[in-house]
Amino acid sequence: MQVSIACTEHNLKSRNGEDRLLSKQSSTAPNVVNAARAKFRTVAIIARSLGTFTPQHHISLKESTAKQTGMKYRNLGKSGLRVSCLGLGTWVTFGGQISDEVAERLMTIAYESGVNLFDTAEVYAAGKAEVILGSIIKKKGWRRSSLVITTKLYWGGKAETERGLSRKHIIEGLKGSLQRLQLEYVDVVFANRPDSNTPMEEIVRAMTHVINQGMAMYWGTSRWSAMEIMEAYSVARQFNMIPPVCEQAEYHLFQREKVEVQLPELYHKIGVGAMTWSPLACGIISGKYGNGVPESSRASLKCYQWLKERIVSEEGRKQQNKLKDLSPIAERLGCTLPQLAVAWCLRNEGVSSVLLGSSTPEQLIENLGAIQVLPKMTSHVVNEIDNILRNKPYSKKDYRS
């Protein structure tokens, strides 16, 4: 657009010369000359009008803020899809830790706060999370066009053909998800992990097929390496198919390298954005584990023994000490430690959206408050945090320089 305007402005400057040329030709082709002049004037008028609003439009494409809720919206990668910078995830909670009534309350709070992104997966609570999410959307009567619904495929069932990223499971798995969600399509379908048993061309062809069939608008990856994402993009370009637009990756104060080093390079090269999850590191950054593992916490559950071991390990104790050192920064900014952690994730402009996981309305409201903390995340504050964490990743280019 900028190039077109620049060329048009150049044409406007040389308009007198063109008029003289047209006047010389007018004796032989008056109709052609008049048509050319009319077309030129139309282009000039359009160029002037575009010149007045293009800069503002360019800014809004990067980030915009809803006046009523204060929610910020960003593009998902280099696609045109606008997503709220905070989304609501359903892992563990929907169909598991919380009741259907609490799930409805959480979705209502999120929606009324400006959240338009809701993420789920076929494997969450064995499909029940999708059922609950779809039922709430239908009950609330929210306009489908106002929502961005994403789901993930890989673990669909116990049968050998009900998992993986074969063409069969991608198509059948997405059909099953749509039935549970009671939706005609999802906005983004994610490959929930890489599949070494399926050729990349088959995966990309299947994702392109479900998009062409109207079952999804875009497709993305989750837990894929940069090399695997690049391979998918190359295959898509080679065979004129649709490449992925986004990678779902874990990102928090103690997990940084992929989102801060690998994905930015992919974004600039092929336009793949980042949708991140677990901003509180499965609750480790919430502050509840500073004095051990409470009985009512997620880490106390039998199926989360790995989380408990992680917390009580030597590395876990070091992380808790670092969180204590971060608390004064949060107090100075007038926020809680979880709000600081979420705002820290949002300060990364390469992150399109951060998925929140909450089991109570109070937790969700607190985490949504990170939007108000984001303007306070100055370079000085970020440097303070880096000095405490001492885990800032660097690319090979940085080391060479």
Curated annotation (Swiss-Prot):
Name a GO molecular-function annotation.
voltage-gated potassium channel activity
Catalysis performed (reactions)? a primary alcohol + NADP(+) = an aldehyde + NADPH + H(+); a secondary alcohol + NADP(+) = a ketone + NADPH + H(+)
Q: Which GO terms describe its biological process?
A: diaphragm development; heart development; learning or memory; myoblast differentiation; regulation of delayed rectifier potassium channel activity; regulation of potassium ion transmembrane transport; skeletal muscle tissue development
Q: How does it sit in the membrane?
A: Peripheral membrane protein
Main localization is cytoplasm
- Does Metal-binding show up as a keyword for this record? no
Entry annotation: catalytic residues: Y124 (proton donor/acceptor)
Q: In which tissues is it expressed?
A: Detected in brain. Detected in hippocampus, in the middle third of the molecular layer of the dentate gyrus and in the mossy fiber zone of the CA3 region. Detected in globus pallidus and pars reticulata of the substantia nigra (at protein level). Specifically expressed in the nervous system. Detected in mesenteric arteries.
Q: Name one GO cellular component term.
A: neuronal cell body
Q: Does the keyword RNA-binding apply?
A: no
EC identifiers of the protein:
1.1.1.-
Q: Which residues bind NADP(+)?
A: 90-91, 97, 119, 192, 222-223, 248, 277-282, 288, 298, 357, 359, 363, 366-367
Which enzyme class, named as a word? oxidoreductase
**Highest taxon listed in the record's lineage:** Eukaryota
Q: Which residues form a coiled coil?
A: none
Domain comment as written in the entry: The N-terminal domain of the beta subunit mediates closure of delayed rectifier potassium channels by physically obstructing the pore.
PANTHER family per the record? HYPERKINETIC, ISOFORM M (PTHR43150), VOLTAGE-GATED POTASSIUM CHANNEL SUBUNIT BETA-1 (PTHR43150:SF7)
Quaternary structure annotation from Swiss-Prot or TrEMBL = Homotetramer. Interaction with tetrameric potassium channel alpha subunits gives rise to a heterooctamer. Identified in potassium channel complexes containing KCNA1, KCNA2, KCNA4, KCNA5, KCNA6, KCNAB1 and KCNAB2. Part of a complex containing KCNA1, KCNA4 and LGI1; interaction with LGI1 inhibits down-regulation of KCNA1 channel activity. Interacts with the dimer formed by GNB1 and GNG2; this enhances KCNA1 binding. Interacts with SQSTM1.
Q: Which family does it belong to?
A: Belongs to the shaker potassium channel beta subunit family.
Q: What protein name does the entry list? A: Voltage-gated potassium channel subunit beta-1
Q: Which organism is it from?
A: Rattus norvegicus
